Amino acid sequence: MRHLVHSTTTRASIFATIHVPATLHLMELLEQSGLRTYVGKVNMNRNCPVYLREISKNQAVRDTVAWIEAAEKFEKTKPILTPRFIPSCTDDLMYALSEVRRQYGLPVQSHLSENFSEIAWVQELCPRSKCYGDAYRQFGLFGGDHRCIMAHCVHSGELEQELMKENGVVIAHSPESNINLSSGVAPVSRFLDNGLKVGLATDVAGGSHESILRAMMHAIQASKLRWRLQDQSVPALSFDRAFYLATMGGGEFFGKVGAFRDGYEADIVVMDDSSLDHPQELSVRARLERLVYLADERCVREKYVAGEKVL
């Protein structure tokens, strides 16, 4: 929590745990921090360790509803439905969560097409689906009439990409996690060229750090390797596009966030780059690029979220 508060992040969507008390405690800490966040009590009732498995669909739904209603007291920290992913949730639980979503008007977050074995597994579990994303759609948990974040999407095919575009699903690109787990590298430039919504994620603990600056660097580097070694029809990410992912791309999920524009909420991070020595005078653009590659939370001096000073 301390690292997140002192980082460049102003808003986040977070996976918690299956446990209601722990999830509410996390939400209390985030509420005190001044950040604007969504937090999900994770649902999973199969294909996971017993100590992290919800004992039944009915109990999972009761716990989820109790958590949602207990979270109504928070102003800056909101609940988001979080089925871990299809392999860890039975069909009846997924349908029940869809009903909860409709009843409480909640957004949804989960995982999608992170690796090939996962995609094949979902096809076995949901043989009527046309693709992984279509399985979520059939359960009523894939955007359209609600906001939805899907993490990774490393191997999303054309049909899945079209479904995400049609339903306004936001892709949470998690480059370091995808590298650490040998999942692959998502074709982010293609997503953007095709009009999909994409933001940047750190995916702790698949990733090693909460820094969105580091995530920008990893996104650029991974895209260059993908271009060189896998598919030169998909250009590497430019710095401008990586910066967009870290600001307006992810910020769109929260509303008008991520830019200095009329009508946008004032999320501002003030950084001091004086410790990053350089023998020449640099332009503002060069200084910003240098911050992304070299800075950490020690360079953060002040932070404002929706105009309120939080650091």
Outline where the language-model segments fall.
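Divalent metal-binding segments
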Residues: 1-22, 87-93
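Alpha-helical segments flanking ligand/cofactor-binding loops in enzyme cores
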Residues: 2, 28, 95, 161-162, ...
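Divalent metal-coordination and catalytic microenvironments
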Residues: 8, 30, 81, 111, ...
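Metal-coordinating catalytic core of metallo-dependent amide/deamination hydrolases
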Residues: 21-154, 159
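Short, acidic/turn-prone active-site loops that include or flank metal/cofactor-
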Residues: 42-45, 114, 175-179, 204-206
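His/Asp/Glu-enriched, well-ordered alpha-helical/loop segment
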Residues: 134, 138-144, 189-277
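A conserved active-site cap/scaffold subdomain adjacent to cofactor or substrate pockets
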Residues: 157-159, 165-202
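C-terminal cap of metal-dependent C-N hydrolases
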Residues: 265-311
